[in-house]
Amino acid sequence: MIDLAAVEQALALLFTNFSPWMVVVPGIIIGLIFGATPGLQISMAMAIFLPMTLYMDFVQAMLFLTAIFTGGSFGSGIPAILMNIPGTSSAIATAFDGYPMARQGKHNQALGVALASSVIGVLMGYLILFLMIQPLSFMVLKLGPAEMFAVILWGMTLIATLRGEHMLKGLMAGFVGMLVGTIGFNELGMARGTMGQTFLLDGVPVIPAMMGMFAASELFKLANKGYIVESEASRKVKISEIFQGFKMAVTYPWVLIRGGFIGVFVGAVPGVGSSVSNLLSYVETQRRDKDPSSFGKGNPKGVVASESANSTSEAGSMATLLALGIPGGGATAVMLAAFAMHNITGGPQFIRQQTDVVYAIIFANFAQVFLLMVIGLLFIPLLANIVKVPMRYLIPSVLVLAVMGSFGLTGNMTGPATVLIFAVVGWLLRHYGYSVPAAVIGMLLGAMAEKSLLHSYQISGGNLAYVLERPVTLIILALLLISLFGQHLVNWFRRRRQPLGA
């Protein structure tokens, strides 16, 4: 139920003086820069600038950190579209169709689609948060480790179906990725798959591996090309085409709405967030489309699905932070630290006692959406010029960027070595028709799946009947089976219903 008195107080907090808004534009710019730079994480940006929030009041601090979050969510899609390097794991699906659009000379439209989808996604996400923060937090509390494991398996199954007729290859790639993701210490302190190498005790660095498999392996294919976009006329940066991308995104309202709801609800699950939601949204959009084979070849619906879910995930993770005091991921973990610095404890009591502050944070993000649109439009033409750079300069530049970013993440040569090794792995997967995205997602979710499975085993005492007592788990497992066999069953029934003479 909406507290109208708290709404009035929230508006007073935001608009009585201009000071809360002084930090929003710098925050969005910081987020855009960190999100658009491969190897730099949104949570890293927030952590670096966290000490500055000591000199702000709580509302101003939240506006600053959420502005970084908002800018970074869009920024991570820019290198995914222009260079096939997702700035963060939340932009993996953006690269599936965004990069092919750029290769076709539609980089301006692709960036416009991404910006419009991000803007609408943030707006939709915080609107859902405003209306549903309390019931949403109650639903999240119902999800235990068994449900988490089922969600991860379902997500992996959906990613595998991206291969269409090569589903088995997709499943195999995802399974191998999950095995790689479990290398290192497990929850019980046991080391697995390290082959005696101490640098693997902490596991394979996922972000450098992702850079290698997506970006560096793609460079092998482009080595004999002159430019990313071969046509000189198509390499021009045109504001009019960026606005065409804006209009294009709005023509797919159901894709935006579906991505928005997937982003909010999956983003609200701690530890899952936008890394999974953008992929689930992409796969669901492809599955429901009249021409699923066009995805992965430059279909703008793929960019819309990914970016809308990616952006609304922010609101979902904020729901668990505000309503339960539980961070949904790295970015909201930094926000939780800001809560502690200002002697604030998130949770049901916080919502009841400081509803005006909660509403102020939500309303401020409505305004941030329009600032993101303006700043994004100024930012895009600058970055879109990358398609004008000859490949003889771009390939070494991207490799140096990937190597430097990976070194910054690990602090030693493990990161650069991981990039190069997984570049070869990515090239081999592409060459033999296996799904690179499925392998990467398997790596991202492998440790999470193992942790959830172990906790489920400990809670149930090894009793499989425990699953039968969890209706949500059964529903998710049913969805998993539908995603695997649903289309085959539909086709079978259609054949049965056709007259014999037809």
Which ranges hold each PLM region?
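Short helix-coil transition sites and intra-membrane helix breaks within transmembrane domains
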Residues: I33-S43, I81-I92, M124-I128, V266-V276, ...
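Membrane-interface alpha-helices at helix entry/exit sites of multi-pass transporters
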Residues: V59-L63, P100-S117, K290-G302, G330-A333, ...
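Re-entrant/interfacial helical elements at transmembrane boundaries that shape
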Residues: Q41-M52, L65, A80-P100, L131, ...
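Membrane-embedded alpha-helical modules
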Residues: G112-Y227, M341-R495
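Helix-loop-helix hairpins and the membrane-proximal interhelical loops
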Residues: M1-A61, G193-N299, A384-N385, L401-F407, ...
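Transmembrane alpha-helix interface/packing and boundary motifs in multi-pass membrane proteins
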Residues: P26-I42, G71-N84, I159-G164, F261-P270, ...
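A structural-propensity feature for long, helix-poor, extended segments
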Residues: F69-A80, N299-L324, G328, G346-I375
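Flexible loop linkers connecting adjacent transmembrane helices
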Residues: I48, L82-Q109, P135, G144, ...
